[in-house]
Every structure is written in structure tokens, then in C-alpha cells.
From Swiss-Prot:
Keywords: Membrane, Transmembrane, Transmembrane helix. It is found in: Membrane. The chain crosses the membrane at residues 52-72, 97-117. It comes from the Viruses. This is Uncharacterized protein L801. One of its GO terms (cellular component) is membrane. It is a multi-pass membrane protein. It comes from Acanthamoeba polyphaga mimivirus (APMV).
């Protein structure tokens, strides 16, 4: 468990050796434990936070477009049969939130690619610095 070169912040011990051959394993510490450092936990937290923000934007766009449809369409024909009016409003709001969810999904993927690229660039720079 003691490794002088790597000092993890969080260590999960499975108590099982995951290597195929225990004698061939060069580093038994990394075969037995799952190790999280602060950078990885920050990345996972940012990923979850972005996902929650995107879900919130999609839900908010649904309610805004539904309310906008109710405010804009003041045709008295719709008010005779309120269920048709409500069905059309829900259909419009669903279409708007689908379009926004597509853009949010693209933005989420681009943010993930940016973060991974940034992580590898800083990792490469730091590895060259300490060689």
C-alpha cells in the first residue's frame, strides 16, 4: 500500500488482485486498488455539474416555450376545446426542447473533448518538464 512516487487522495481497496498472473505483475499496488486523485474527482464533479446544468436548460426551455405558446396564441377557437389547445402547446414545447437538447448534447460533448484535450496537454507538458 505504500508507494513513495504516487500519493493518492482516495484509495478504494477491493482486496482482490486483478492481474492475470500475480508473479508477472510489476506493481501490485495498482492491480489491487482503484486510485482517485483530486484532478480526476474534480473532472467527474465538473462533468456531473455540466450534465445537471444541461438538463436544467432543457427543462427550462420546455416550460418557457409552453408558456410562450399560451401567451402568443390567443385564438378563441382553441379556447372552445381546451384539450386540443393544451395538446398543441405540449407538442410545440416538446419540439422546442428537443431542438435545444440537441444543441446542449453537442455542447456537452464539445466540453468533454475540450477537457480531455486540456488534461492531456497539461499532462504532456508536466511529463516533459520533469524528465
Amino acid at each position: 500500500m505504500h508507494n513513495k512516487r504516487y500519493n493518492p487522495d482516495v484509495v478504494i481497496d477491493f482486496g482482490v488482485d486483478f492481474s492475470n498472473d500475480y508473479n508477472k505483475s510489476k506493481n501490485k499496488f495498482f492491480d489491487r486498488y482503484i486510485i482517485f486523485n483530486k484532478d480526476f474527482m474534480k473532472y467527474i464533479f465538473k462533468l456531473a455539474l455540466r450534465a445537471l446544468i444541461m438538463i436544467g436548460i432543457i427543462e427550462l426551455s420546455y416550460f418557457i416555450s409552453l408558456g410562450g405558446f399560451y401567451l402568443v396564441s390567443n385564438d378563441p377557437i382553441y379556447f372552445r376545446n381546451l384539450s386540443i389547445f393544451h395538446a398543441r402547446g405540449v407538442e410545440f414545447a416538446t419540439e422546442c426542447s428537443d431542438i435545444i437538447s440537441i444543441f446542449c448534447s453537442i455542447a456537452f460533448v464539445l466540453f468533454c473533448i475540450y477537457d480531455v484535450g486540456k488534461y492531456y496537454v497539461t499532462k504532456c507538458k508536466s511529463s516533459k518538464r520533469y524528465q
